[in-house]
């Protein structure tokens, strides 16, 4: 987990929508410790009892238009109180004009003022998601993360079972590699877990007998992705002829990752099985279930109906014979 995000990093990563309006010399010294963005409302009326100074202060059309109705002395007072040492920056949306009193207060407190042409709601959601991803607590999982037809699939299993080789086969079939060997995961929201590669391992794979390969260099930029939501876990296990594997798909297993239960499918591996195609089909079948089509349930319903029909025919035949 990152304890902080540098303001300079946030500006650099969002340079297409953010600009430094004032206080460029103060940017490098500012750090952000919370992901929430704050729109000061009551503070403009003079109420500061619960003012979260440590957040980015976002002023949109509502805040700017209300401030314009205040007297000069009152504007100076409220903006001076808002400009604390803990405040990372002020952000003005919709390219609105910056109040002179805010500009002076920010300059005195060494606080940068940023501006964007985006709407207030949009920029708030973009920056909140950005900060949550970088401030979230991270865990590491041994496995390989790939994206199959837009769905994040985590391959797990014992060392040597063939996770990396299987992922390489999936990349050759047009899917994307996210992370090999070590997957860093974090909880994006209540029901969503995101996985990514550590910076040092990004786009790299280790293949026994070959060594380290650069997937982006060999297969192109379309073969890799920086991160993806983990929607399915596929656990590869060595084939055991004595084991009783699920043949119909009635068993529904899950794996807990970052306090979120992720559906898991166990796939036995042995010579002669095309694991890449099986995994591809497993992912598509999982997506079909999410869309409401469950082949296993349909088979079960058809079988139940067939048994019911035969039972009725047998009953009618017995009654007729009597």
From Swiss-Prot:
Name the record gives this protein: HPr kinase/phosphorylase
The EC number(s) this enzyme carries: 2.7.11.-, 2.7.4.-
Alphabetical list of Pfam families matching this protein: Hpr_kinase_C, Hpr_kinase_N
Important for the catalytic mechanism of both phosphorylation and dephosphorylation: region residues: 205-214
Gene name in the database record: hprK
A GO molecular-function annotation: magnesium ion binding
Membrane-spanning parts: none
UniProt source species: Lactobacillus acidophilus (strain ATCC 700396 / NCK56 / N2 / NCFM)
Residue positions binding Mg(2+): 164, 206
